[in-house]
Amino acid sequence: MTDHKPSKSLPKATAKRLPQYYRLFKSLVEENVTRTNSQLISEKIGVDAATIRRDFSLFGELGRRGYGYETKVLRDFFGELLGQDQETHIALIGVGNLGRALLHYQFQDRNKMRITQAYDISGNPLVGTQTDDGIPIYNISDLEKNVKKSDIKTAILSVRKENAQEVVDTLVKAGIKGFLNFAPIRLKVPSDVVVQSIDLTKELQTLLFFMNDNKQ
């Protein structure tokens, strides 16, 4: 297989499918399946075979015509792309209802992503305590100081949209390079900082649209 890493111009839609590919090949290896093809991959993840082949072509030769794809090779390839072997420590900002759920969320087995710090305003009674898993919940006034002293480069935002930009500005100064943002606002960040936003209201509205469209 050609050793080929994606360029920064990798289409966003393709990038969003990378975790699907990794989970599928990981599952196939665990099921002792050694080889597969684009049609079988399509049936497993609900993406058409032509799109899968086009995605894979962006990385060089991941398989061979008439032979297919070796599951272990592609599991390792996509795992490396997604940093599965890297220990990733994450700061969570906002310990309201959603934040508490995220604190207790168990990332997939053998995944090395961990929330190691959480923050909220002083009025939250959880500030100054820690979770059953030992995650400390700090006052947000300590945010910049603590993050600067840590190895954390990734943050999850679960704050009100009115406060989101101010929090992001503080975290960027502290060295954060990536945000998973649940606030319904477009954040302004430097060009070397990545933001992935999840708007739950928008996602539900899209779901309802497709549900209503199916009725017609």
From Swiss-Prot:
A Pfam family this chain is assigned to: Put_DNA-bind_N
Role: Modulates transcription in response to changes in cellular NADH/NAD(+) redox state.
Assembly and interaction partners: Homodimer.
One cellular component (GO) term of this entry: cytoplasm
Residue ranges the UniProt entry marks as DNA-binding: 20-59
Family per similarity comment: Belongs to the transcriptional regulatory Rex family.
GO biological process, any: negative regulation of DNA-templated transcription
Source superkingdom: Bacteria
Keywords: Cytoplasm, DNA-binding, NAD, Repressor, Transcription, Transcription regulation
Compartments in which it is found: Cytoplasm
Binding annotation for NAD(+): 94-99
Protein name according to UniProt: Redox-sensing transcriptional repressor Rex
GO MF annotation: an example: DNA-binding transcription factor activity
Primary subcellular site in the record, as a coarse category: cytoplasm
